[in-house]
């Protein structure tokens, strides 16, 4: 009889992941890739940095992530750059470098300035999508998108490993973040896109 405790095995698995941040964090971009895809300008740091994962929320930053400082109606991501860097962001993308102080990024994070951070997010998602030679089903319309997406993903999942939009995470940000969840094991993607602008 071999002693087995699933709690111990689970803990060992989690601890082994902490040793290598690249183990479960995608997408992986070099900073040179980020600059080439976005047309951004490197303000601080060096191009030898590797990015593990993309985040637009400073509260969920993981070690090695690239934080993209989006600007919304009620918030400005530039205000959260210090929190993102303190939480382990390897780099930040901003549209106005004058809004962040050198102390906010310290010596560890890279700073890339672009004209439009939302556009940069979409460009990075597009570049990441092109790494996968899988079919993509896009759903849009004025009503019924989420229900149709859920049904289609459920049907396809009977035969394939499916990536699909969670809930109604279907705006420009949500679509990009869904694409960043693509993994080599996925065989098809079902993506929902809202129609709130021309």
What do the PLM-derived regions correspond to, one by one?
Residues 1-123:
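N-terminal leader/targeting and accessory segments in enzymes
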Residues 119-198:
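Phosphate-binding loop of NTP-binding sites
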């Amino acid at each position: 009889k071999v002693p087995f405790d699933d709690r111990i095995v689970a803990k060992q698995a989690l601890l082994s992941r902490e040793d290598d941040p690249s183990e479960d964090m995608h997408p992986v971009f070099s900073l040179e890739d980020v600059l080439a895809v976005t047309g951004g300008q490197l303000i601080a740091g060096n191009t030898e940095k590797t990015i593990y994962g993309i985040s637009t929320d400073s509260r969920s930053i993981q070690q090695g992530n690239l934080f993209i400082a989006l600007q919304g109606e009620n918030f400005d991501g530039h205000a959260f750059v210090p929190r993102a860097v303190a939480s382990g962001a390897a780099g930040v993308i901003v549209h106005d470098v004058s809004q962040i102080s050198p102390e906010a990024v310290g010596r560890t994070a890279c700073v890339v300035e672009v004209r439009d951070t939302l556009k940069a997010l979409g460009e990075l998602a597009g570049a990441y999508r092109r790494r996968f030679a899988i079919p993509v089903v896009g759903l849009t319309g004025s009503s019924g998108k989420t229900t149709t997406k859920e049904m289609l993903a459920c049907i396809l999942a009977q035969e394939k490993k499916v990536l699909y939009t969670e809930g109604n995470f279907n705006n420009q940000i949500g679509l990009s973040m869904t694409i960043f969840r693509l993994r080599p094991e996925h065989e098809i993607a079902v993506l929902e896109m809202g129609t709130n602008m021309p």
